[in-house]
């Protein structure tokens, strides 16, 4: 599979009184064509900022990309101007948000919101775009699409709105779909349907998905590969099967053991002690050291780099240094 | 677009629990607006006043400037519905023609100042930073000058006339609208659907004017309605002071000024009464309609 998106050493900083706050600090990963990659981590680990950096939208929320490159096929997105970005947003890269209740404009009809993208990116005539929009709505499972076109968002349920969002996001057949916690705000039965729909459609269009979530259930269901982030850094990068079978990084292990097991006999859930340090107050050594059960002396003073484990996975931990791992 | 399969997959087809007829915004709006009896009354009276102003030449029994010194200070009666003034002019006819001036000045200056205020307020609220600072300081400066003095000064520099009055009301009236719209934009710009619009590649000007602005329209319409009333008042006040519409063109304000004489007020009560009554009624009706609109357009006020 050829690489679609390559993120290298991405550093996105925010500034408070000229003081830099590293929200994303040297993130590397890639997504192949047609692949679904999950980006996992606690709140504040930099998942959403990474996705906004790819979309070129961090500037508007006050962030700045300080270093690194984001390559979509052969285009370097970090050198793009706002105008260049407008041409690829929605067309080559699109995004679905967490809150379907608020991500549709309340004063525009569903039809207006779908046709807008088509008219803009595909240069369609109004009539043509309407027809295509109806097709798209049918594709995401609305049987009375014609009628939905005339509805305002407040008349639809959360699941229906999220399906409309999916229709909008996929309307121009993008190469990459960034889904920022697409199912968090939906109830469980709808979650599965929306996830299924998203996967089906992306397979059909050969669209890659960057799935941002903190729900490991969603990850195991939908993703091919998982990237675990902690404090703005990638700490582990592995296929889903490997990660769930044998988590390498103590943080990943912590995440996995803190999922309740339905038929398990543990009466108290395992929690990772402490909380995520704020990005303006990071520990000097390994960022996970203060919460890590396996922390060694050097973890407190030295920062581990991303190592390639013998299985080909990458992990950011000193534990694996001796096991014949080499620095990547 | 042949790569798309357009039949819906049955397993994901959900119940679409939507009643047959889509509830349009207009329908919801009318339902709420019609509940407010005062607003309806105001709208009806305003409609009558506006229509009679538009068709003034057809309705008015006399030309507005026709003098008849023999008939001066005639009390209201069949011949002169609202009596006559000191030149024997028919007051009813003059009020109809005066309505044209007052309403024209009211509507035109409000449309102008709303346009200026909305655009500047939207830019300030959306871009923030230096744009916001510059626009808002200009607003502060204009607002810190007492309106009536500014109006009088400007009127003395330019010659008074309907067009000059409209221009001046536009230049002073946009500030409050700009503040209102800026506030709306500051809160609306960070909504998720604005971010969503950005992620599909919508250009900035489209985001401002076709995504955010419609969401801010409610407060703008309400303030516009209330503003018409206050501009009519200001125009009357200026005309009353002699800086506004100049005789012989009739305006409600300068008719009042004509009548400001103790003996006139005692002997010909109808002379000041009717222009005053019309100013009062029109402004009151605009306020009633404005209140009604505010309730009807407020999304939080759900029946």
From Swiss-Prot, chain A:
Show where the ABC transporter domain sits: 5-256
> Where does the chain bind ATP?
41-48
Q: Which PROSITE patterns match?
A: ABC_TRANSPORTER_1, ABC_TRANSPORTER_2
Please provide the record's keywords in A-Z order: ATP-binding, Cell membrane, Competence, Membrane, Nucleotide-binding, Peptide transport, Protein transport, Sporulation, Transport
Q: How does it sit in the membrane?
A: Peripheral membrane protein
Give GO terms: molecular function aspect only: ATP binding; ATP hydrolysis activity
* GO biological process entries: establishment of competence for transformation; peptide transport; protein transport; sporulation resulting in formation of a cellular spore
Q: Where is it localised?
A: Cell membrane
Could you name the Gene Ontology cellular component terms for this entry?
plasma membrane
Q: List the disulfide bonds.
A: none
Q: Which protein family is named in the record?
A: Belongs to the ABC transporter superfamily.
The role this protein plays is:
This protein is a component of an oligopeptide permease, a binding protein-dependent transport system. This APP system can completely substitute for the OPP system in both sporulation and genetic competence, though, unlike OPP, is incapable of transporting tripeptides. Probably responsible for energy coupling to the transport system.
Q: What is this protein called?
A: Oligopeptide transport ATP-binding protein AppD
> Which gene specifies this protein's sequence?
appD
Curated annotation (Swiss-Prot), chain B:
A Gene Ontology biological process noted in the UniProt record is: sporulation resulting in formation of a cellular spore
Q: What Pfam families does its record include? A: BPD_transp_1 (PF00528), OppC_N (PF12911)
Main subcellular location: membrane
Q: Where are the transmembrane segments?
A: 39-59, 103-123, 138-158, 165-183, 212-232, 269-289
Top-rank taxon: Bacteria
> Would the keyword Flavoprotein be found if you checked this record's keyword annotation?
no
User: What cellular component terms from Gene Ontology apply here?
Assistant: plasma membrane
Keyword Membrane among record annotations? yes
Tell me how this protein sits in the membrane: Multi-pass membrane protein
Q: Where in the cell is it found?
A: Cell membrane
Alphabetically ordered keywords of this record: Cell membrane, Competence, Membrane, Peptide transport, Protein transport, Sporulation, Transmembrane, Transmembrane helix, Transport
Molecular function in Gene Ontology = transmembrane transporter activity
InterPro entries xrefs: BP-dependent_transpt_permease (IPR050366), MetI-like (IPR000515), MetI-like_sf (IPR035906), Oligopeptide_permease_AppC (IPR053523), OppC_N (IPR025966)
Q: Which PROSITE patterns match?
A: ABC_TM1
Residues in domain ABC transmembrane type-1? 99-290
What does the similarity note say? Answer: Belongs to the binding-protein-dependent transport system permease family. OppBC subfamily.
The record's function comment reads: This protein is a component of an oligopeptide permease, a binding protein-dependent transport system. This APP system can completely substitute for the OPP system in both sporulation and genetic competence, though, unlike OPP, is incapable of transporting tripeptides. Probably responsible for the translocation of the substrate across the membrane.
In Swiss-Prot or TrEMBL terms, this protein is called Oligopeptide transport system permease protein AppC
Query: Species name for this entry?
Result: Bacillus subtilis (strain 168)
Species lineage:
Bacteria, Bacillati, Bacillota, Bacilli, Bacillales
